[in-house]
Design a protein with these regions (language model features):
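N-terminal-proximal low-complexity accessory segments that begin disordered
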Residues: 1-44
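Generic structural signal for well-ordered, non-transmembrane alpha-helical segments
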Residues: 35, 39, 135-138, 178, ...
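Glycine-rich flavin
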Residues: 59-194, 200-209, 222
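Inter-helical turn/loop segments and adjacent helix faces that build the functional surface
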Residues: 119-124, 300-312, 335-340
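FAD-binding core of flavoproteins
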Residues: 151-281, 458, 463-495
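A conserved active-site cap/scaffold subdomain adjacent to cofactor or substrate pockets
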Residues: 245-330
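Short, charged, amphipathic alpha-helical segments
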Residues: 311-316, 344-352
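Alpha-helix capping/hinge segments and adjacent helical runs
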Residues: 349-494
Length: 497
C-alpha cells in the first residue's frame, strides 16, 4: 500500500479539471474546492501504515509475516467477506458515510470487471487483461472510480437516435480504440486516477458491449465537477461539509486513446460489474445511518432527554433501521454466491433487501435527527461567538449546563445540523434517491435474486391433504431491469443554439 503522500503526489499529473463556479483547477491538492477531500483520501491510505488501525484494515500475517490490505483482497470465503466488511465499516463511519468511493471500492469494480469478462468468455486475453489490471490496483493502490457510462441529458435529447449514445468510436488502431463523447454523472473523478466507463456508454465492438478504463490524466480527457456544496468558512459550523465533498462530475473525452488492455467486452447491462460494488455502497448508506443514530444518542444525553419516552421512541425507530441493514449485511457475507472463479460475491438478495430498507428509511432518519434536539439545532452558536466578549458569557448561560459547556453542546449541535441540514446532506439525499435506478431498480434486483418462489409456494400446498398441481414460479426471476430515466425529445421543437 502506498502512503498518503505518494497518493497526493500522483494527483499532480496532467489532469484537466473544472469545478462549476470555480473554473479550471490547476492543482487539486491545494485548491480550496478540492484540497480537504484530498487530505481525507491521504488519511485513508495512511491508516494502512498506522499500527492502531492495522488489525482492522490489514489481513493477518501470512507465513512470511506479511500483511495485505483488506481493501484490495479477493474474497475466497465468508470469513474474508466479514473481515472486508469490518474494514469498510471502520473506515467509512468516521466520514459519516460521506466517503463512498475509495481505492478499495475501485478494487471491487475491478473484481466485477474480471467476473464479467469471465462470464462473457470472449477471449483468454480479456481475462488476462482484467486480472492484470486488478492486480495492478492491489499492487500499487491506484484509485479507480465507477461510471455506468450514461449519456448527458443533451445527448439523450438529440433528434437522431443514432447520436444519443454517450460515446462513439472515432477509429480503431493497433494500440486501442480512440473514443469521443461525454459521460454523465459519477462520483469522485477529480480524486481518482482511472474511471471505469460502463456499458451504458453504448459502444459496441466485435458483437459485444465495450467498456473502458480511462486514465483521468490521459490526453483529451476533461473532468467537469458540480459546484462545491455550500458551507460556512468556519469549520466549527461545518465540521463535515468542510472536509467531505466527493464532487460528482462528468467525463468529456476528445479523441482519447483507450489501450486494448483497458477495453473490456461485456453484456449491455452493467449489473454483473456491480455485484461487489452494491455491497460496499450499502456499507456507506449504513455508515450514514449509524452516524445519524450516534448523533441522536449523543443529543439525547446533551439535551437532557434520556427520560423522555417520545424521544426514546424516535431513537428506537433509528435503532430498528440500523439493525435491519446490519443484519442484511451479515446475512450477505455469511450466505455468499460463487463468482466464475470461485470468489465469493455477497448474497445479492440480502444486499437488495438491505438497500431497499435503507432507501425507504433514509429520509425519515434525517427527519428524526432534525426533530430530536429541538430549536437549539437551529440557533446554536459558533466557537467564535462564544469567544466574543460582548456575548460570550450570555451564550454560556444559554447553552451551557447539565454537564456540558456551551462550546461542547454547540459543537455537537453543529455536527448534527451539518449531517442532516446542510447542502452536503441535500446532495447526498438527491443523489441516493435515484442511485442505481432507485427503489424500482432495487425491487427488480430483489425479484431476480430471491430464490425461494417455488419452494415456498409448493411448501404451502404440501400442508393440504389433497393432490395439488406443482407450482413453477421461478420465471418471476426473469424480469428486465427498469430502463433508467428514458427521455423523449419533444416533436417538432426547433433546436436552440
Amino acid at each position: 500500500m502506498r502512503t498518503g503522500a505518494e497518493y497526493r503526489e500522483a494527483l499532480r499529473d496532467s489532469r484537466r479539471v473544472f469545478v462549476m463556479g470555480e473554473g479550471l483547477i490547476e492543482d487539486v491538492t491545494v485548491h480550496p474546492a478540492t484540497r480537504a477531500m484530498v487530505d481525507e483520501y491521504v488519511t485513508w491510505y495512511d491508516r494502512h501504515h498506522d499500527p492502531a488501525w492495522q488489525d482492522v484494515v490489514l489481513t493477518p500475517p501470512d507465513a512470511q509475516g506479511e500483511r495485505a490490505p483488506w481493501a484490495f483482497a479477493v474474497p475466497r470465503s465468508a470469513a474474508d467477506l466479514r473481515a472486508m466488511g469490518r474494514s469498510y465499516s471502520a473506515t467509512i463511519f468516521p466520514t459519516a458515510g460521506n466517503m463512498t468511493h475509495t481505492p478499495g471500492y475501485g478494487n471491487l469494480i475491478a473484481l466485477g470487471i474480471l467476473d464479467a469478462v469471465r462470464q462473457r468468455k470472449v477471449s483468454p486475453r480479456q481475462v488476462t487483461d482484467a486480472a492484470a489490471y486488478r492486480d495492478l490496483l492491489a499492487r500499487t493502490g491506484r484509485f479507480l472510480t465507477f461510471s455506468a457510462g450514461t449519456a448527458t441529458i443533451g445527448y439523450r435529447l438529440r433528434p437522431d437516435p443514432a447520436e444519443r449514445a454517450a460515446l462513439r468510436v472515432v477509429r480503431e488502431t493497433d494500440a486501442g480504440l480512440v473514443v469521443r463523447g461525454k459521460v454523465g454523472m459519477h462520483t469522485s473523478p477529480v480524486y481518482a486516477e482511472d474511471v471505469y466507463v460502463g456499458s451504458h456508454s453504448g459502444v459496441d465492438h466485435a458483437g459485444h458491449r465495450a467498456t473502458f478504463v480511462v486514465a483521468v490524466s490521459a490526453p483529451g480527457v476533461t473532468v467537469l465537477c458540480r459546484k462545491v456544496s455550500a458551507r460556512h468558512s468556519n469549520p466549527f459550523l461545518a465540521p463535515l461539509s468542510s472536509r467531505f465533498d466527493e464532487l460528482d462530475g462528468q467525463l468529456w473525452l476528445d479523441d482519447v486513446l483507450v489501450p486494448w488492455e483497458r477495453v473490456f467486452l461485456t453484456e449491455p447491462s452493467p449489473e454483473p460489474i456491480a455485484s461487489w460494488c452494491f455491497w460496499h455502497q450499502l456499507y456507506c448508506w449504513l455508515a450514514k445511518a449509524e452516524f445519524t443514530l450516534g448523533l441522536a444518542l449523543a443529543c439525547v444525553d446533551a439535551m437532557g432527554l434520556r427520560e423522555h419516552e417520545p424521544t426514546l421512541e424516535y431513537v428506537m425507530d433509528l435503532v430498528t433501521d440500523v439493525q435491519t441493514v446490519r443484519s442484511c449485511q451479515t446475512a450477505a457475507e455469511l450466505d455468499p454466491e460463487p463468482a466464475e472463479d470461485g470468489a465469493c460475491i455477497p448474497g445479492r438478495a440480502h444486499v437488495a433487501a438491505g438497500s431497499l430498507a435503507m432507501q425507504r428509511a433514509r429520509q425519515r432518519m434525517a427527519e428524526i435527527l432534525r426533530i430530536l434536539p429541538g430549536s437549539s439545532l437551529v440557533v446554536a452558536p459558533s466557537d467564535k461567538d462564544l469567544a466574543t466578549p460582548e456575548i460570550g458569557a450570555g451564550l454560556e448561560e444559554s447553552f451551557g449546563g447539565g454537564g456540558y459547556t456551551a462550546l461542547q453542546r454547540a459543537a455537537l449541535l453543529q455536527l448534527a445540523a451539518d449531517h442532516v441540514a446542510s447542502a452536503l446532506d441535500g446532495r447526498e439525499s438527491a443523489f441516493e434517491l435515484h442511485a442505481n435506478g432507485g427503489v424500482m431498480a432495487w425491487r427488480a434486483r430483489l425479484r431476480r435474486a430471491f430464490s425461494c418462489y417455488d419452494e415456498l409456494a409448493n411448501g404451502v400446498l404440501r400442508a393440504l391433504s389433497l393432490d395439488m398441481p406443482s407450482i413453477a414460479l421461478d420465471s418471476l426471476r426473469a424480469v428486465a431491469m427498469p430502463q433508467r430515466r428514458p427521455v423523449t425529445p419533444p416533436p417538432g421543437r426547433p433546436e436552440t443554439s
